[in-house]
Amino acid sequence: MIQQESRLKVADNTGAREILCIRVLGGSGRRYAGIGDVIIATVKDALPGAGVKKGDVVKAVVVRTAKERRRPDGSYIKFDENAAVLIKDGGDPRGTRIFGPVGRELREKKFMRIISLAPEVL
C-alpha cells in the first residue's frame, strides 16, 4: 500500500535507486496504490552518470509491496519491500532490465513488457 511520501526501491537499471511517491494516479481522491498501479514520483537517490538524476519527476508502476494483497482465489501475496519500475508515458519501462520478482497483477494491468523482462512473476 503506497501513498504520498512513501519511499520505494527502484527495481530496474535506469540508475535511480530510490523514489518518493508524490501522487497516486487514478482519480482525484485516490489515496493508496497497490501492485500494478501507476504513481508519479521524484528521484531521491541515483547513480552518477545515469539516465535519471536526483530531483527528476518520473512515472513509475508499483511491482512489489510489503502490505499483503488478497487475490481473487483467496491467497495473499506480500514482499519484503516496496519497489517500482520507472516507465515512459506509453507504459513501456525506461530501463532494459528488471531486478527481483514482480506481482502477477501486472499481467492484468497490461504491463506485458515488464512481465517479459522480470526474472520471476509471483
Curated annotation (Swiss-Prot):
Keywords: Ribonucleoprotein, Ribosomal protein, RNA-binding, rRNA-binding
InterPro entries: Ribosomal_uL14 (IPR000218), Ribosomal_uL14_bac-type (IPR005745), Ribosomal_uL14_CS (IPR019972), Ribosomal_uL14_sf (IPR036853)
Coiled coil: none
Record's keyword annotation contains RNA-binding: yes
SMART domains named among the record's database cross-references: Ribosomal_L14
Taxonomy, superkingdom: Bacteria
CDD domains: Ribosomal_uL14 (cd00337)
Signal sequence segment: none
GO MF entries: large ribosomal subunit rRNA binding; structural constituent of ribosome
One cellular-component annotation, GO: cytosolic large ribosomal subunit
PROSITE patterns: RIBOSOMAL_L14 (PS00049)
GO biological process terms held by the UniProt record: translation
Stated role: Binds to 23S rRNA. Forms part of two intersubunit bridges in the 70S ribosome.
Subunit relationships: Part of the 50S ribosomal subunit. Forms a cluster with proteins L3 and L19. In the 70S ribosome, L14 and L19 interact and together make contacts with the 16S rRNA in bridges B5 and B8.
Family affiliation: Belongs to the universal ribosomal protein uL14 family.
Entry protein name: Large ribosomal subunit protein uL14
Record organism: Acidothermus cellulolyticus (strain ATCC 43068 / DSM 8971 / 11B)
Gene: rplN
